[in-house]
A protein has these predicted regions:
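Subset of outer-membrane beta-barrel
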Residues: 1-354
Length: 354
């Protein structure tokens, strides 16, 4: 799947508009044996990308000369995820599944505090870490038929929380702009990053394979995690693991799909029409305040691909709007166009010669 994004950010009277395009994910699934399936893929796990600054006046002398300070914030990097999953149906309607993933990547963040008065030192903080570790997810699903035309599906998932064996570091550089003299202090926290445990559940309803409606809930237990934090203790700087920087994140998702007749000879009756929406509470605390919550709305359709030997693959096109908002912080609106291709198993069918 490929995504095209248009990001609009606003803080007070300041506005920023940015565009980007990227490859979102590649996944595949196949049947290994009766009641046993396999899935694998490459998907993004986290993504960091920002560059902004703010300037404020801190002093005006008797000659009305202003002294200003500028804080510049830059972040880049992220984690990638490659996974291998298996699903097993021990009896009709009930399935178990497990995904084992490998995570890798790094992040770099910097905060540079400079002044218009060249006699005042510039303070730069550089945060970085590299991650190479695993992720484990398990789930179960049960489908019950309510009538000849209706069936309901219940599901649950659990993600294992654990430390990532990564050593985040912080470099603090104090430099005098006039003399160029600098002083550097380096901090490192051993095994300082971790994934939160997560648990979720979902409910789906299928009517005649025409109308499908689903709702999901996900709880990420961020409040139980700790994260490296730069503080002062008795006048001494320290970079240590700190709890209470996060709160649990709750995410609610709702979606629906309609296809009049997937086997119809009429093109528009085979079209898939989809809508979805989600809401997520903030998990990050910034200076004691809650970070941004997230609202997302999407709509799209699936176009059937028809040729002489395949009539079940689908070209998926959707539009998504995401808003992240927190009081007195940057408000971010993202508009994305997603294009993906779903291959049906007949693309990989074996030809037989009689």
């Amino acid at each position: 799947s490929r995504g095209l994004g248009d990001v609009y950010k606003r803080q007070g009277s300041r506005k920023l508009n940015a565009k980007n395009a990227d490859l979102e994910y590649v996944v595949a699934g196949l049947r290994l044996a009766k009641h046993l399936g396999l899935s694998f893929g490459l998907v993004p796990f986290t993504n960091i990308g920002y560059n902004y600054s703010n300037t404020a006046t801190i002093h005006i002398d008797e000659n009305y000369t202003k002294t200003t300070t500028t804080n510049a914030y830059i972040g880049k990097g992220g984690l990638h995820q490659v996974y291998l999953g298996a699903g097993w149906e021990p009896f009709k309607g009930f399935s178990l599944g497990v995904n084992v993933s490998y995570l890798w990547g790094k992040y770099d963040r910097s905060i540079v505090n400079s002044y218009s008065d060249m006699s005042i030192n510039t303070i730069s903080k550089y945060y970085s870490a590299s991650v190479h570790n695993y992720k484990l997810d398990v789930g179960l699903q049960y489908t019950a038929r309510l009538s000849r035309q209706d069936q309901v599906t219940l599901g649950a998932i659990y993600s294992l929380g654990h430390r990532l064996n990564a050593d985040p570091s912080l470099s603090i550089i104090s430099q005098n702009p006039q003399t160029g003299i600098r002083d550097t202090t380096l901090f490192t926290v051993n095994n300082g990053l971790e994934l939160p445990s997560a648990i979720g559940g979902g409910l789906g309803w299928n009517h005649r394979n025409q109308l499908k409606i689903g709702a999901d809930y996900l709880l990420q237990q961020w409040s139980k995690t700790s994260y490296p934090n730069y503080t002062m203790a008795n006048g001494n700087p320290q970079y240590v693991l700190t709890q209470g920087m996060f709160k649990d994140r709750h995410k609610f998702t709702f979606g629906g799909e309609f296809c009049q007749d997937a086997n119809s000879r009429h093109f528009f009756q085979r079209m898939h029409y989809r809508i979805g929406a989600s809401y997520a509470t903030p998990y990050l605390k910034i200076n004691g305040q809650d970070g941004p919550s997230e609202i997302s709305v999407s709509a799209g359709f699936g176009i059937p691909i028809v040729n002489s030997w395949n009539n079940r693959s689908i070209l998926n096109i959707s539009a998504q709007w995401v808003r992240q908002d927190a009081k007195d912080f940057i408000k971010e609106n993202t508009f994305r166009i997603n294009i993906g291709l779903t291959f049906n198993e007949r693309w990989f069918a074996k030809w037989k010669v009689q």
